[in-house]
């Protein structure tokens, strides 16, 4: 699994695999210096203003950069809502053999195939389509496309949606998603990205309620009381529970977690072996200050 970070000089950027930067008025020397400093990272260059990119002929900066430093690893990112001139910029990048993708949240198969046909280097999979990762990831990978997700936000289209039936990834389930997801990008405040990254990549667990690190999750459910098979069952379930299917596994996981909590137990494997929990609740802000500052 690779971890992405939106550029913030207060963070330990070296601990991430990918850095997202916003393209503003940088000169060639500025870009070259940044790329040399983080030459072992993949750089995502976010184009905030397509009209300005065309008017300033900024493509020439990167043509020079590519010619002199073909070893640099980078792609372009176009803002989702910057409709003015976006198609023209995409065509320009395509004609000059630069990789790119758009900040579109891909939530169904039609959007996914449009991203494939448009030649995206990456796709951001969200909402219900995340419950088909087992099926769609091999397709996207066959086209050389990176699969990106936001693991730390409860994803649903409506506020009254069921939290546990929404898409998110527990810290304990990272290994399950690794064959299907290439890049984790974190939702939330820029200065907390490193805290989230440490939860998913170092701790790989969270002792406390899910709503302390899964943004938008309202229920008081402790992730470490959920059966270890939780993530695996959701990889390709297709959210059949919302289509008239009989699957009620997510509800069952919640009921079981409630029972385990009452008895201060944690399940450690599929054979239902349990151990006594020594849990202490942890707050994301406390974790942030303790581990980052």
Predicted regions mapped to residue ranges:
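Active-site pocket-lining/capping segments in soluble small-molecule metabolic enzymes
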Residues: 1-111, 118-293
């Amino acid at each position: 699994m690779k971890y992405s970070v939106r550029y913030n000089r207060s963070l330990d950027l070296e601990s991430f695999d990918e850095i997202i930067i916003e393209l503003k008025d940088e000169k060639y020397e500025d870009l070259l210096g940044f790329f040399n400093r983080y030459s072992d990272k993949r750089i995502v260059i976010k184009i905030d203003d397509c009209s300005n990119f065309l008017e300033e002929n900024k493509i020439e900066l990167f043509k020079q950069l590519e010619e002199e430093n073909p070893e640099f690893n980078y792609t372009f990112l176009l803002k989702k809502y910057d409709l003015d001139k976006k198609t023209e910029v995409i065509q320009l990048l395509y004609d000059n053999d630069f990789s790119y993708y758009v900040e579109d949240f891909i939530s169904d198969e039609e959007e996914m195939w449009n991203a494939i046909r448009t030649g995206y280097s990456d796709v951001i999979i969200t909402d219900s389509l995340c419950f088909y990762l087992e099926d769609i990831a091999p397709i996207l990978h066959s086209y050389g496309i990176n699969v990106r997700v936001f693991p730390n936000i409860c994803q649903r289209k409506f506020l009254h949606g069921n939290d546990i039936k929404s898409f998110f990834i527990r810290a304990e389930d990272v290994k399950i998603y690794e064959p299907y997801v290439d890049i984790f990008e974190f939702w939330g405040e820029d200065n907390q990205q490193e805290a989230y990254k440490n939860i998913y990549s170092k701790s790989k667990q969270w002792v406390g309620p899910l709503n302390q690190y899964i943004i938008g999750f309202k229920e008081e459910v402790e992730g470490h009381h959920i059966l270890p098979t939780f993530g695996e069952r959701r990889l390709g379930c297709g959210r059949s529970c919302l289509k008239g299917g009989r699957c009620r596994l997510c509800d069952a996981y919640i009921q079981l977690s409630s029972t385990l909590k009452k008895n201060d137990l944690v399940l450690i494997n599929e054979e239902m072996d349990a151990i006594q929990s020594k849990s202490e609740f942890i707050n994301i802000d406390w974790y942030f200050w303790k581990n980052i500052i």
